[in-house]
Amino acid sequence: MDTPESVTPAVAEPGPGETVANESHYHSKKDRIFVRAIQGAYSLKDELVRLRAMPRVRKGSEIKFNDGPQAYSRHYVEPKDGITQTFHLHLEEYGPGGKSQKHGHVNEAAFYILDGEGYEVHDGIRYDWKAGDIAIVHNNCVHQHFNASATRPARALVIKTKPMYMFMNMLFQKQVEPRPSEPAPGAEWFKAREGEDDFNHESD
């Protein structure tokens, strides 16, 4: 991996009219909050009251995809939401023939493949996957994700420990190749699927 760069977490709060459901503080869109501030004395009792008042179910229909046009992200749980401080949960959707950015970082990640067929390239080695598989990105691995189908999308649910690593000041991350700014050839029509399809049960 190339010499890593330090990424300093931003401390800016969402501005007026911005909501967690409609926008995410990732990539080049906005300042990012990876870890909420911890400062001064606090009451564990008050913190428990606050946590218990948080929603136990987040409506996926209210959380929109961003990025694209080949790789889209929908961030379900982030530290800035106030629900969790140690992990990051998001959905990735790859258009037909699409690919993600190529980068590397200190934290590991697990990709549960929900739909489609594709492959990873980790440190120059290809690993194929299909729906039902789990792809593991290990620490300090330069990686990129690819949809192997030219006609169908693919999607994966991703769990990361990135916020915990940021909290421990293990901030090293390096982008090697940015997300494509143009659709994959032949997939100019594709938009991320906002709805969830049930692939496991027959319709009544």
Sequence positions of predicted segments:
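A short, N-terminal "cap"/entry segment at the start of jelly-roll beta-barrel domains
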Residues: D2-Q85, F172-D204
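Conserved short histidine dyad/triad with adjacent acidic residue
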Residues: S73-V77, L89-G104
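Short histidine-centered beta-strand/loop micro-motifs
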Residues: E78-P79, K99-H105, D128, F146-A148
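Glycine- and acidic-residue-biased ligand/ion/polar-headgroup-sensing regions
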Residues: P96, N107-G118, D123
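Short beta-strand His + acidic residue motifs that chelate non-heme Fe in jelly-roll/DSBH
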Residues: S100-K102, E120-V121, V137, H143-A150, ...
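A generic "binding-loop/recognition-motif" signal
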Residues: V106, I125, C141-V142, K162
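Short acidic-glycine-tyrosine-enriched beta hairpin
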Residues: G124-N140
